[in-house]
Amino acid sequence: VSVITSSHLHDKPLRPEDATNITLTKDSLEAEDNNGRFEIMKPPGAWKDFFDRMLSEKGGGKKRKASNFTTPFNGERYRCILADSSGGQVITMRKLMRSIPRVDKDLGLDWNAIRPLLEGSGLTIFAGQMSSGKSTTMISAIEQLGRKRGNLGTVEDPIEVEFQGGGVIQREVGTHVDSFAEAIRDFVRQYRNTIMVGEIRDPETADAAVLAASLGHSVVGTLHADSAIDIPTRMASLLDPKLARILPSVLRGLWWQHVYRRGDGKSKPLPIYESLYVTNSVRQIIADGPEKLPQLMNEMVSQKRVSMAQSATAWVSKNQATREELRQWLETRGRINDSQLDYVR
């Protein structure tokens, strides 16, 4: 491997095979691993051959339209997007999981904080920004529930990992079903106790998820949001107004997380998270409107749940990170502000 540049010149060079995120062109390969290490190199022979093969197999059709696909390579599975650019064709790749990690031992999260958010029926949202690990946490939590979850239906884009042991229907958007919403409606008719939605990203999916939860199913999905308190706002902005009114009654649990990666090749990723169990008092606050949502912080305190600032502070106190590194989570980041209130009025 010919390294052009590295984010950490004294570390052992990062191999493409060890990267979780890759950007590949005919002349360069950008690699980033789960610890945040980043390097740019010339594509090794096997990767150059892969690039040429994907252009031949997937590069047809309209140049301005990206091609999304999942493919095996070098013993791994990758989620790929092939797209045109001013510099030529580009393939962005994300390595998919081989097996399901454990919530506590592998992800470093508190299972006792997550478990109550998944009990019974209703809607539980795992939120965060891009590359925050929210999907991995959701999948790990569902796996750890085991038989308590009942029979399971999952819809993803793509399927991240296969659940083992039977009692599972897994569907991939674009391969087995046309949309997330269609799969959710099918799962309701197929009597799936638990329905896992890879991403709630459009109104149709949000509406279907809330309807399924209102019918007594356990619905679990991911959503882009800046904090646990931000989740009801983001969810309501997607929903039909009639369904937005019943959102407080079907919500069961809110989980938000981010993963800080130092990028030194030695430090483990540090999870920063906060959560809220949706009690009757929480439902009332959400129902009272966006102006009342900051009161959810008090509910978090009364439930003895960790806020994102407390979670970040714990890593600083353990000398795993500095205050400067985690400053954006130690401050009042992602809380309700005027622009968010205007967005949902």
Stretch-by-stretch model annotation:
Residues 1-345:
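Short, flexible helix-loop junctions that flank or precede catalytic/ligand sites
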